[in-house]
Amino acid sequence: MMGRVPDGPTGLAALVPSVEEAQAMLPPRRLRLLLSIAAVVLTLDIVTKVLAVKFLLPGKSVSIIGDTVTWTLVRNSGAAFSMATGYTWVLTLIATGVVIGIFWMGRRLVSSWWALGLGMILGGAMGNLVDRFFRAPAPLRGHVVDFLSIGWWPVFNVADPSVVVGAILLVVLSIFGFDFDTVGRRKAEFDIAGQRKAEQR
């Protein structure tokens, strides 16, 4: 006959983590998820840029779907989708600050959706930073390689839509009450006030 599992720290309860312990384990996992997503985006961005430089000629488009979708190699001194050209070094410093900020948030990250959005932004920002630092004409002022043209939209690379989609995801999460350092949606202020009144009765 099996004996009863004793209660207390030596029993079964000791094997089940508390809510606080479970939440404490989430940031390292979410940081790993964030970095994994960023690594995938960064790898795709670097590989596709290397292939574009190797096989495409500047100023000569290669048709994918007629004239609507083409491979078109350009060197971009501006931000995503060729915006803010002429401010290369400023954009480099801004992107560097974004990367540092994401790493800081990643240490406190609890939400897996925020990990997805931040990972996409981090991977895209680092992909374009590689060009800023290591491509001509000079460090901090390197021109980003863009190679995909769709209709009237400016030529872009893998990093550009990754940053934009990641940013949109974070905005949506914020609007619907999902914070990066909490599990689930945050409670509205009137819900919290109502709960406090109920507890006081």
From Swiss-Prot:
GO molecular function: aspartic-type endopeptidase activity
Active site location: 146, 160
Source organism, top-level taxon: Bacteria
Localization per Swiss-Prot or TrEMBL: Cell membrane
Transmembrane segment boundaries: 33-53, 86-106, 110-130, 158-178
Record GO biological process: proteolysis
Pathway(s) per entry: Protein modification; lipoprotein biosynthesis (signal peptide cleavage)
Disulfide bonds: none
Keyword Lipoprotein listed: no
Enzyme Commission code(s) on record: 3.4.23.36
Cross-referenced PROSITE patterns: SPASE_II
Record has Protease as a keyword: yes
PANTHER family for the chain: LIPOPROTEIN SIGNAL PEPTIDASE
HAMAP family xref list: LspA (MF_00161)
Annotated protein name in UniProt: Lipoprotein signal peptidase
Species: Mycobacterium leprae (strain TN)
Underlying gene: lspA
